[in-house]
Design a protein with these regions (language model features):
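Conserved catalytic or regulatory cores that recognize and/or transform ribose-phosphate-containing ligands
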Residues: 1-230
């Protein structure tokens, strides 16, 4: 069955994107150590992101938290030339992007994601209290930019990234509560927009789910038939 014939009858004006009932949180931030083997003792906490990962594992109804480094082979086959392109596509299929500003890498991720319009309203940033009043590029530029577009997108907490073992439990709990609250207020549907890259990713997924075996060229042609070149 040619997907173009099916899509020819689709009314884009009446089409909606229905988001997953099991949302995924892309969690970026500081270093998270891996256990040497399943029976090894847990290593010391190395970052707020590490503490959040452990917190989620101990919760009964924790949000599904995913870290970019869990995919080890992103650079193979030449699909992605750099990590940020990979993370941008990964973020497209996640419901929320949470960033703990506690490392050089997390600052780079913050700068990249904050400039992508599709992500600005699903971005939540956790900033150490000691950085909050600093007249830096991050505060005066990036964080102000996020606040203007997503009023609850920046949260300040009393923790010092240099001393991860001293992160208070109430900080970890508060951050997790903020993540859950953001997920609860996310829109469940959106009108389909071919100008939204996130919607294009969802559309590609649905095409593959419906037609199972599609060549890359067939997917491109099907979406082109809707009026979008990719």
């Amino acid at each position: 069955m040619d997907p173009r014939h099916i899509l020819a009858d689709v009314d884009l004006g009446e089409s909606k994107i229905y988001f997953s009932k099991n949302p995924i949180v892309l969690l970026c931030g500081g270093y998270v150590p891996e256990k040497e083997h399943a029976d090894a003792k847990d290593p010391p906490v190395r970052s707020l992101r590490d503490a959040l990962k452990r917190k989620a594992l101990s919760m009964m109804n924790a949000p599904h938290i995913f870290r970019p480094e869990e995919i080890k082979s992103w650079h193979e086959d030449g699909v992605y030339r750099n990590l940020m392109d990979f993370e941008a596509d990964l973020a497209s299929i996640c419901s929320l992007i949470a960033i703990a500003v506690e490392s050089d890498g997390s600052i780079a991720e913050l700068g990249a994601f904050s400039q992508l319009p599709d992500f600005q309203k699903k971005l939540i940033v956790f900033v150490p209290e000691e950085y909050a009043d600093d007249k830096s590029f991050i505060n005066l530029g990036i964080l102000r930019h996020i606040n203007e577009r997503h009023g609850s997108g920046v949260k300040v907490y009393p923790w010092n990234p240099k001393y991860p073992l001293e992160i208070p439990e109430h900080v970890v709990t508060g951050v997790m509560d903020d993540i859950v609250e953001e997920l609860n207020v996310l829109k469940k549907t959106q009108s389909l927009s071919l100008g939204n890259n996130i919607h294009i990713v969802v559309l590609i997924y649905e095409l593959i789910r419906l037609f199972v075996a599609l060549k890359e060229g067939e997917i491109v042609e099907a979406i082109k038939g809707l009026g979008k070149n990719i």
